[in-house]
Amino acid sequence: MTNIRKTHPLTKIINNSFIDLPAPSNISAWWNFGSLLGICLIIQILTGLFLAMHYTSDTATAFSSVTHICRDVNYGWIIRYMHANGASMFFICLFLHVGRGLYYGSYMFTETWNIGIILLFAVMATAFMGYVLPWGQMSFWGATVITNLLSAIPYIGTNLVEWIWGGFSVDKATLTRFFAFHFILPFIISALAAVHLLFLHETGSNNPSGIPSDSDKIPFHPYYTIKDILGALLLILMLTLLVLFSPDLLGDPDNYIPANPLNTPPHIKPEWYFLFAYAILRSIPNKLGGVLALIFSILILAIIPLLHTSKQRSMMFRPLSQCLFWLLVADLLTLTWIGGQPVEHPFIIIGQLASILYFMILLVLMPIISIIENNMLKW
């Protein structure tokens, strides 16, 4: 008798993706983040769906509808904070996932990598629009500042901004369309994630050594299903601790003040996961230059495969490249800190130096160090 799991058209796809998938025998915990991102996406879609049942995307009632969710809806507060902090967990997993890809040379799977970059942009867009919805002070002014950046585009900039706003300022039309996009994008992200996985399964997973592992594969289930379940439990534990003990730790207190176009907050800043990009944006005195640097700070990932000069794929056996990688991590943490600081001395110069170093490491130092390592090994 044939196994329905292996023959039925639907279960066959699931079987070949999550059960009988041949996986490298040596992939470490850094390979857990793909499944964790999937779990984060499911949590966000479910909590978001329940929030959307009670939320109203109208400037007059948006803020009070969020208050109503937290006060009057059964377990509304936990749904709201699971969604808000779930976004933070999502970005932690995203950054670690991208970092893993950089460290172990997973970007050599160019299709998978490029879909991943599109996914990163889509998640960032979704998070930005979601932050506008509670219609607090930081929601309103964050939306105003970030959408206004498009006015730096020559000739069409001003018209483009007014078209996105649906008027002459961030108002009811903007909030309504942001809610619509915020609702639809996670489903587009889900479809893109499926394509991401499709391309990955064309080549098979990379592994820490960067050496092809075709000669040594093990089935995904039970070895990596149990490993992913452990990762998922740790993720849910961290999220639960955050939600139940300090739900506002990563938020901005200004967002508990209803949006007021007549009163600008002293420090306009995005959520923590955008601070590194915000610091790069602010470090360039020219508006268009800042916007280009902001976009390129993420888009630079697309040219990483072209800058791979090493004869080895992974950094596992390349100590000089490892030092540079961790310098890059420290630099990104510095940028994150600077993004949350006011624009004054010494933060301005620190931000500018950190921004220069960020692009220097990725565009110049990494390729040069890789060539030096090749020569040291007489390759």
Curated annotation (Swiss-Prot):
CDD domains: cytochrome_b_C (cd00290), Cytochrome_b_N (cd00284). One of its GO terms (cellular component) is respiratory chain complex III. A ubiquinone binds at H201. SUPFAM superfamilies: a domain/subunit of cytochrome bc1 complex (Ubiquinol-cytochrome c reductase) (SSF81648), Transmembrane di-heme cytochromes (SSF81342). Binds 2 heme b groups non-covalently. GO terms for molecular function: metal ion binding; ubiquinol-cytochrome-c reductase activity. It is found in: Mitochondrion inner membrane. Its cofactor is heme b. It holds the Pfam family Cytochrome_B. One of its GO terms (biological process) is mitochondrial electron transport, ubiquinol to cytochrome c. Its main location: mitochondrion. InterPro entries: Cyt_b/b6_C, Cyt_b/b6_C_sf, Cyt_b/b6_N, Cytb/b6-like_sf, Cytochrome_b, Cytochrome_b_C_euk/bac, Cytochrome_b_N_euk/bac, Di-haem_cyt_TM. It comes from the Eukaryota. Heme b b562 binds at H83, H182. The cytochrome bc1 complex contains 11 subunits: 3 respiratory subunits (MT-CYB, CYC1 and UQCRFS1), 2 core proteins (UQCRC1 and UQCRC2) and 6 low-molecular weight proteins (UQCRH/QCR6, UQCRB/QCR7, UQCRQ/QCR8, UQCR10/QCR9, UQCR11/QCR10 and a cleavage product of UQCRFS1). This cytochrome bc1 complex then forms a dimer. Belongs to the cytochrome b family. Heme 1 (or BL or b562) is low-potential and absorbs at about 562 nm, and heme 2 (or BH or b566) is high-potential and absorbs at about 566 nm. Component of the ubiquinol-cytochrome c reductase complex (complex III or cytochrome b-c1 complex) that is part of the mitochondrial respiratory chain. The b-c1 complex mediates electron transfer from ubiquinol to cytochrome c. Contributes to the generation of a proton gradient across the mitochondrial membrane that is then used for ATP synthesis. This is Cytochrome b. It comes from Mustela eversmannii (Steppe polecat).
